[in-house]
């Protein structure tokens, strides 16, 4: 992969976007960015606080702005938030400004990977499985719509998935 084109990772929470993104960026000698981390840096507060104070709608407005800004960078690997594809504008920007890889995983893996994470406001409920199932129903088609590639992450290490993505990009 001679040119350093942007790589955008989309998928549900717990799919491994941040972990795989770090491996991918390191192996490709690219900068790694995480849209949720950038939102926290810009607001000076964590995502849960933004959700509490501004609600999901306020968070999504911030997220759309961050996606717009970050997708204009060059030579980055970007891990997006699980809900970033809700915005048509964000989907258009992701598609137009880089290669989009959908990291797909099962509800069971999502539950296992997120069960102790208190930084996920949508999962602060007694029924996280139901929430994840509802989110999958709402978002999976959007992930597929925006993606150039789909990679299943269930039983593979982040390093293996990163290598699979690199191989796909080299064959492109």
From Swiss-Prot:
Keyword annotations: Amino-acid biosynthesis, Aromatic amino acid biosynthesis, ATP-binding, Cytoplasm, Kinase, Magnesium, Metal-binding, Nucleotide-binding, Transferase
Pathway named in the protein's UniProt entry: Metabolic intermediate biosynthesis; chorismate biosynthesis; chorismate from D-erythrose 4-phosphate and phosphoenolpyruvate: step 5/7
GO MF annotation list: ATP binding; magnesium ion binding; shikimate kinase activity
Main location group: cytoplasm
Database matches in Pfam families: SKI (PF01202)
Binding site for ATP: 14-19, 120, 156
Binding site for substrate: 36, 60, 82, 139
Enzyme Commission number(s): 2.7.1.71
One Gene Ontology cellular component: cytosol
Cofactors named for this entry: Mg(2+)
UniProt xrefs under PROSITE patterns: SHIKIMATE_KINASE
Catalytic activity reported: shikimate + ATP = 3-phosphoshikimate + ADP + H(+)
Compartment(s) of residence: Cytoplasm
NCBIfam families recorded: PRK05057.1
Function statement: Catalyzes the specific phosphorylation of the 3-hydroxyl group of shikimic acid using ATP as a cosubstrate.
Family: Belongs to the shikimate kinase family.
HAMAP family: Shikimate_kinase
Name of this protein: Shikimate kinase
The organism of origin for this protein: Aliivibrio salmonicida (strain LFI1238)
Gene label: aroK
